[in-house]
């Protein structure tokens, strides 16, 4: 595991701005309103030659444990315990506040290695705050400006000995580990081209849904620990939080997204940023888990979210949460399946699983459904099998003959995976009705065991494959005309 640095401090001192600078991307929401970041967010940081993991945390606040701020504080304390070092930020322009003093005392008593950073230190207005920071007893403060990139060399110098010491310890542990030989069969055939998730490219799963459907609670259950802030308040999650996890040796990166509401209801500037962040997470994901509330399933916004995931070409799993609160489970399940088939025909056959994020029931079913959806999304069908299948489908139900012209479906191949995409070479592709395309897509789903995954089917004329079609025949230049054809004898 890489060296981990947690950025902590009270709200609005510039933690997310510094996080974005270290990661090199705009991953965290940034606003001048305190308390924008509410969860733990991880990123791969680059600072000069240094490479490490950085955690952006919720703002430290003095608050009762039952309040939202109290839960944010507990989550931050957890990040400090997980990290190899933490960078405690204060606002140099404001100076040291009583809240800074309280949390500096907490950090001094912790076992963590603490660096002190005085952010927003650009300009003369920050000089007094920089001097005040010495009184916190955390060593010499680093004068930083996350917004303008100032002080990064000093931060590099402070982190370098910590990371070097960490890597020496890691290398010593690796050298002591036993070696394992893996025998490879040179005659083994590669039957599929399915990409197996790796640490560098893990399986990417996004959990989406309306506000307060239980997305963060669900992810905490899958992780086996409280990494995301949860509570009864709707809209607690404001960023698309990305977390790494391991499913029985399979590397997975899971995205918790802000709840998506109708555009008319998304008025606050921060919520608009959060929802667009969630939409971006859907585009990055391979499998999208659409989380419904069992009490009010398949609301209009649920249908929009599921349709968006399908149009983006993602594998989709429907998960119905709060199942522990249902009394007539059999009757409710039958009702859900009927509504699913009626309201989301474009996702016909996609997995529908019932879960309880609160109690942890159904987590194994959900995980199996995600892995199955991913496998189908990556599936490739041999060309010979496709063309035998196409012949049988045409024989059973020939395409129509508009205007007396018989349409011939000559050849079929799979052009892509993720999601599966097929091309049929035919005559008059523009004349093939949508109903016949649906007939073929439904047949592909059923006969090649591809339930629920988006399938793209394109009808193409054989002449479309000719790159020289509609190109004018080149005429000889005046010089060639004058010289005539070159003699073969030279």
Swiss-Prot record:
GTP 2 binds at residues 209-216, 256-260, 321-324. It comes from Dinoroseobacter shibae (strain DSM 16493 / NCIMB 14021 / DFL 12). Signal peptide: none annotated. Residues 469-484 have a biased composition (Basic residues). Residues 379-465 form the KH-like domain. This is GTPase Der. It comes from the Bacteria. One of its GO terms (biological process) is ribosome biogenesis. It holds the Pfam family MMR_HSR1. HAMAP family: GTPase_Der. GTPase that plays an essential role in the late steps of ribosome biogenesis. NCBIfam families: GTPase_EngA (TIGR03594), small_GTP (TIGR00231). Belongs to the TRAFAC class TrmE-Era-EngA-EngB-Septin-like GTPase superfamily. EngA (Der) GTPase family. Residues 451-490 are annotated as: Disordered. GTP 1 binds at residues 9-16, 56-60, 119-122. Residues 3-167, 203-378 form the EngA-type G domain.
């Amino acid at each position: 595991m890489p060296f981990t640095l947690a950025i902590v401090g009270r709200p609005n001192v510039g933690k997310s701005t510094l996080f974005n600078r270290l990661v090199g991307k705009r991953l965290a929401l940034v606003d001048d309103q305190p308390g924008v970041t509410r969860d733990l967010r991880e990123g791969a940081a680059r600072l000069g030659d240094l490479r490490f993991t950085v955690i952006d945390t919720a703002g430290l606040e003095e608050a009762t444990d039952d309040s939202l701020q109290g839960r944010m504080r507990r989550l931050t304390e957890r990040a400090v315990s997980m990290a190899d070092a933490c960078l405690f930020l204060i606002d140099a322009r404001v100076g040291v506040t009583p809240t800074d003093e309280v949390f500096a005392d907490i950090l001094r008593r912790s076992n963590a290695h603490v660096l002190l950073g005085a952010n927003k230190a650009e300009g003369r207005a920050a000089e007094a705050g920089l001097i005040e920071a010495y009184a916190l007893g955390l060593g010499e403060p680093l004068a930083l400006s996350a917004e303008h990139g100032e002080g990064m060399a000093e931060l590099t110098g402070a982190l370098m000995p910590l990371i070097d010491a960490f890597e020496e310890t890691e290398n010593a542990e690796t050298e002591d580990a036993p070696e394992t030989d893996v025998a490879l069969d040179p005659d083994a055939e590669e039957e599929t081209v399915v990409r197996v998730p790796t640490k560098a490219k893990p399986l990417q799963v996004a959990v989406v849904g309306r506000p307060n459907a239980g997305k963060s609670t669900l992810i905490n259950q899958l992780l086996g620990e409280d990494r995301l802030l949860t509570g009864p308040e709707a809209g607690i999650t404001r960023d698309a939080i990305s977390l790494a996890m391991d499913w029985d040796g399979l590397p997975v990166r899971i995205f918790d997204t802000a709840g998506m509401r109708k555009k008319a209801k998304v008025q606050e500037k921060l919520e608009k940023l959060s929802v667009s962040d969630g939409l971006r997470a859907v585009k990055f994901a391979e499998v999208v888990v659409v989380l419904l509330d069992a009490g009010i399933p398949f609301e209009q916004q649920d249908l929009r979210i599921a349709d968006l995931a399908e149009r983006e070409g993602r594998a989709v799993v429907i998960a119905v949460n709060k199942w522990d609160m249902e009394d007539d489970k059999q009757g409710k399940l039958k009702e859900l399946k009927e509504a699913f088939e009626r309201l989301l025909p474009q996702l016909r056959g996609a997995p529908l699983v019932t879960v309880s994020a609160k109690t942890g029931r159904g987590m194994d079913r959900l995980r199996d459904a995600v892995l199955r959806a991913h496998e189908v999304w990556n599936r490739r069908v041999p060309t010979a099998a496709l063309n035998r299948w196409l012949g049988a489908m045409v024989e059973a139900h020939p395409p129509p003959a508009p205007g007396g012209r018989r349409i011939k479906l000559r050849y079929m191949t799979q052009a892509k995976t993720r999601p599966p995409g097929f091309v049929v070479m035919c005559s008059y592709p523009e004349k093939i009705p949508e109903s016949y395309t649906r007939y073929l897509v439904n047949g592909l789903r059923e006969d090649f065991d591809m339930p629920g995954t988006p399938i793209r089917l394109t009808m193409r004329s054989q002449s479309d494959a000719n790159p020289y079609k509609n190109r004018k025949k080149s005429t000889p230049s005046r010089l060639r005309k004058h010289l005539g054809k070159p003699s073969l004898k030279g």
